[in-house]
């Protein structure tokens, strides 16, 4: 009998747990348990991002979820986009609670540079952020950069293959957020004994315009993964544009990590 798994899903910046509304029932209908984490100042959390000044505070709901697991339970931890940073942070704390890390169109940090390294490299890329709105907030530890996505940027770079209804939903629900680059640049490197010891795989979309395939391949060359799964025709928001194909990839991962 095929073993069922507990999937813990971590959303991207500026969004919330609502992005998994198509994928969650697919996984549950296959018998898996699914926890879609709502990170701080995201989704329906009423706090503004200015009230969450560090990546540790932002990630606290994920850390609490893993802390609450039964002693011998292992999860498949899926981090989407900026969620790759969140799951690396969680794996550094709870490596024994994670069967495999799944980086889904995600930033893939390493253990040799500061945690902001891949974000710093990403921000050096040409292309710009179009009609996104930038601002800053003074925190106890310095300046925190903030961003609110513009509708043209969202349509062209994140949602270009999604049903129009999902794009309209995202315009209503997306929020101001942060990559916490200033905070991440001051943090200790992720450890080999923690994050570096956990199996990791990558799921990428063939038509991702937010984190381009060339950049994804550079990250994988920089910090290797066990296997790469590619979703043909998926855009950045692949859980909305190609939910069945994403389900198929996650099912394959679940089988590989029985």
UniProtKB/Swiss-Prot annotation:
Coiled coil: none annotated. GO terms for molecular function: mandelonitrile lyase activity. The keyword Lyase applies. The keyword Mitochondrion does not apply. Keywords: Lyase. The active site is at 81 (proton donor/acceptor), 236 (proton donor/acceptor). One of its GO terms (biological process) is response to wounding. Its EC number is 4.1.2.10. It holds the Pfam family Abhydrolase_1. It catalyses: (R)-mandelonitrile = benzaldehyde + hydrogen cyanide. Involved in cyanogenesis, the release of HCN from injured tissues. Displays R-selective hydroxynitrile lyase activity. Also accepts nitromethane (MeNO2) as a donor in a reaction with aromatic aldehydes to yield (R)-beta-nitro alcohols. Belongs to the AB hydrolase superfamily. Hydroxynitrile lyase family. Homodimer. PANTHER family: ALPHA-HYDROXYNITRILE LYASE (PTHR10992:SF1013), METHYLESTERASE FAMILY MEMBER (PTHR10992). This is Alpha-hydroxynitrile lyase. It comes from Arabidopsis thaliana.
């Amino acid at each position: 009998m095929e073993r069922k798994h507990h999937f813990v899903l971590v959303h991207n910046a500026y969004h919330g747990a609502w992005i998994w509304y198509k994928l969650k029932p697919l996984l549950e209908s296959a018998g898996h348990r699914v926890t879609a984490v709502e990170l701080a100042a995201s989704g329906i959390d009423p706090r503004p991002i200015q009230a969450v000044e560090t990546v540790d505070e932002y990630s606290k709901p994920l850390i609490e979820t893993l802390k609450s697991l039964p002693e011998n339970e292992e999860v498949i931890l899926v981090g989407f986009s900026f969620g790759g940073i969140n799951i690396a942070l969680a794996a550094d704390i709870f490596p024994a609670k994670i069967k495999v890390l799944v980086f889904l169109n995600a930033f893939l940090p390493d253990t040799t540079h500061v945690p902001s390294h891949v974000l710093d490299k990403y921000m050096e890329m040409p292309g710009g952020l179009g009609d996104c709105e930038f601002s800053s907030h003074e925190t106890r530890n310095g300046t925190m950069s903030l961003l609110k996505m513009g509708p043209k940027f969202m349509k062209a770079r994140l949602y270009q293959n999604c049903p129009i209804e999902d794009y309209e939903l995202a315009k209503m629900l997306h929020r101001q957020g942060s990559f916490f680059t200033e905070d991440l640049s001051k943090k200790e490197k992720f450890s080999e004994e923690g994050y570096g010891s956990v199996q990791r795989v990558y799921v990428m979309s063939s038509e991702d315009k937010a984190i381009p395939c060339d950049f994804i391949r550079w990250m994988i060359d920089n910090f290797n993964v066990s296997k790469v799964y590619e979703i043909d025709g998926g855009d950045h928001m692949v859980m909305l544009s190609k939910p069945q194909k994403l389900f198929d990839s996650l099912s394959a991962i679940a089988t590989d990590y029985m």
